[in-house]
Amino acid sequence: MTNKNKLTTKEFLMPFILITSLFFLWGIAHGMIDTLDKHFQQILNLKKWQSSFIQFSLYGAYFVMALPAGYFMRRFGYKKGIILGLSLFAAGAFLIAGTTSFESFWIFLTCLFILGSGLATLETAANPYSTKLGPQESAARRINFAQSFNGLAWIIGPLIGLYIYGNQNNAAGEKLTSMILPLSIIGLVVLTVALIFTRLPLPEITEEEVGLGHGIDVSGVEDKPSFHKPLINQPHFVLGVVAQFCYVAAQTGIFSYLINFVTDESQYPRFEVKNGPYFLSIGFALFMIGRMSGSYIMGFVKPTRVLALYSALCILLLPVVSLEMGWFSLIALYVVFFLMSIMFPTIFALGIKDLGPKTKKAASFIVMAVVGGAIFPPLMGWISDIYTMSVGFFAPIPLFLFILYYSLKGHQVKA
């Protein structure tokens, strides 16, 4: 295997392992949070669109924090950005654990916003950093590999949700307090990791190095026209932001409402609410398998072709989910989980390609696009409240259509 085809190089192996651990940490948080919609619907008698403010608070933090986080890292570096993100993550977890006794949805959302600010800061740092820890040619494979551990953590997150759902025989306030132990443990683990990062050396990739692709032949790279054009004049970047918005919107809606889908009274087969997190874990397991297999496939097939095929299949399968075809609908939904797996990291890598010293700033904008996860779930929940949960799964189809366009044409870097 040539140096250009390697996942990473010897000099960047340990930093890559450390950064990959961060993907695992924020995956646990996301996996657990996606189990909470149905939980709050039951405890506080919320409608589906109201419970979706959980996603609004979490992903709204990404929109608010992405640019400040990017500015912080341009001034102080990736390492301090990672430590800041971990600190906010831990603070949010401790605050949620400490305020559940108030039985207030809005206090919970405020604390979740702080936790989400930490996740946004971590993603703003770790996603672009992982693409630069090795040959430029394997950047998409590298971020997919790192994100596969994120997928593994998403499987574990709903199992934490099982602990929360396990308190079904208690009073409402005691149900909410079932979040204290898992959130406290998460806060302690994240705080410990933050302290470890303060003691470990990490190579700081400068703005100039970001554009040069470590460990590969960079002759002529410095003269790429895309290095000198403003970001707004880079179509592959601008469309990448829109594509990421569409993807995270679709992903968040589908993830958030799977438990509602399998427990909906109009749905066959229908399962008990307390078992909902199991079904979400199955979906996340397929998501992780998709990430790992996608990283391997992209060693032989262009990432854009894989993205095009997967988005086209999602467009074809979502109507099967929506038409209430029993087990076929549930299986189709699980296949969509598998297909979505490679989209975020692939769009991210395509969106920041050949941006040189503007990579950190560009990464901030792409992370801001995660706000799609705040805006779309209330719409999907509103449709589901009016009709049925199954009908709500028609809503993501236009989003995958744009991703298909981006994979076929919109990703191309213009000279």
Range-by-range predicted roles:
Residues 121-135, 341-356:
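Intracellular juxtamembrane helix-capping segments at the cytosolic ends
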Residues 33-34, 157-158, 229-281:
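Extracytoplasmic gate region of multi-pass secondary transporters
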Residues 105-122, 328-343:
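Hydrophobic core of transmembrane alpha-helices in multi-pass small-molecule transporters
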